[in-house]
Amino acid sequence: MKQAIVARADIGMGEGKLAAQVAHASLSAYEDAGPKPRKAWKGAGQKKVVLKATSESELFELADVAEREGLPHAVVRDAGHTQLDPGTVTALAVGPAEDELVDRVTGDLPLF
């Protein structure tokens, strides 16, 4: 079981902003999962990986694949209180789900 969080590398988020957006995505996708995958993921150590995307359109393409695969996922839009304009799409989380299912969506992306 794992979760992949894909963050945009093209919008110049500071380290703190990046950490917050990754956390928002992780929690939102966790909430999108059913009780069985949530329990299994928590019991297996809550494995996560943070990956890079190069554009908003890439995040939406990945989200579409996750949707078609029936995987829990969440797209994060920033509130715009600090570094980014309101509504800026910053991250996508896929999972928690079986590793191979998450890899169908995010397996070709580089580490952040």
UniProtKB/Swiss-Prot annotation:
<protein>
    <recommendedName>
        <fullName>Peptidyl-tRNA hydrolase</fullName>
        <ecNumber>3.1.1.29</ecNumber>
    </recommendedName>
</protein>
<keyword id="KW-0963">Cytoplasm</keyword>
<dbReference type="Pfam" id="PF01981">
    <property type="entry name" value="PTH2"/>
</dbReference>
<dbReference type="GO" id="GO:0006412">
    <property type="term" value="P:translation"/>
</dbReference>
<dbReference type="InterPro" id="IPR023476">
    <property type="entry name" value="Pep_tRNA_hydro_II_dom_sf"/>
</dbReference>
<comment type="similarity">
    <text>Belongs to the PTH2 family.</text>
</comment>
<dbReference type="GO" id="GO:0005829">
    <property type="term" value="C:cytosol"/>
</dbReference>
<comment type="function">
    <text>The natural substrate for this enzyme may be peptidyl-tRNAs which drop off the ribosome during protein synthesis.</text>
</comment>
<dbReference type="InterPro" id="IPR034759">
    <property type="entry name" value="Pept_tRNA_hydro_arch"/>
</dbReference>
<dbReference type="InterPro" id="IPR002833">
    <property type="entry name" value="PTH2"/>
</dbReference>
<dbReference type="GO" id="GO:0004045">
    <property type="term" value="F:peptidyl-tRNA hydrolase activity"/>
</dbReference>
<keyword id="KW-0378">Hydrolase</keyword>
